[in-house]
Design a protein with these regions (language model features):
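Terminal low-complexity/charged segments
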Residues: 1-170
Length: 170
């Protein structure tokens, strides 16, 4: 992990290359993170890859910060394999318009991960080549990982288990 000084240096260099992109830095329990403007995430990740050696996108995942606003977050975990360094890039979007640019054109490993964030949290990724649900049925309403999602009620009947699975009733 970059230490505190290294993180601030990276943030400064990113700020020079992409003004206004880095909103805050966070160093907690030896984990370095950059909080970035959602409009700049694709450029920030590209800069981290080309200029700072973070060539592997390990994870894209969603977060719900309910009851705080902006409520929804997307986190990216990058790895520099030559130095075994990790850095997190975090952004937040409101529930009114949860949109962010897709990084799939630059990082193909993000494809299914962005679809999962879309499916579970409802964050749309502009420019994604195939943004549709990946875990839930296409006609499913809601996003199950949001904190205000109602738990309980009727089980979801998937097409492969509607009449054949024991224990499911109609």
């Amino acid at each position: 992990m970059p230490d505190r000084v290294g993180l601030e240096l990276i943030a400064t260099q990113l700020g020079e290359a992409i003004p206004g992109s880095v909103l805050e830095t966070e160093y907690f329990r030896e984990q370095a993170a950059l909080h970035v403007d959602p409009a700049a995430v694709r450029r920030v990740l590209g800069e981290l890859r080309e200029r700072h050696g973070f060539r592997a996108l390990m994870s894209v995942h969603g977060v719900d910060y309910y009851p705080h606003e902006p409520r929804l977050g997307v986190h990216y975990q990058l790895l520099d394999m030559s130095r075994v360094d990790r850095i997190a890039v975090k952004l937040r979007v409101s529930t009114d318009a949860p949109r962010v640019d897709s990084v799939t054109p630059d990082w193909p490993t993000a494809n299914h991960q962005e679809r999962e964030v879309y499916d579970m949290f409802g964050v749309s990724f502009d420019g994604h080549p195939d943004l549709r649900r990946i875990l839930m049925p296409e006609d499913y309403e809601g996003h199950p990982q949001r904190r205000d999602f109602p738990i309980g009620g009727e089980p979801v009947l998937f097409t492969h288990n509607d009449a054949t699975s024991p224990g499911w009733t109609r």
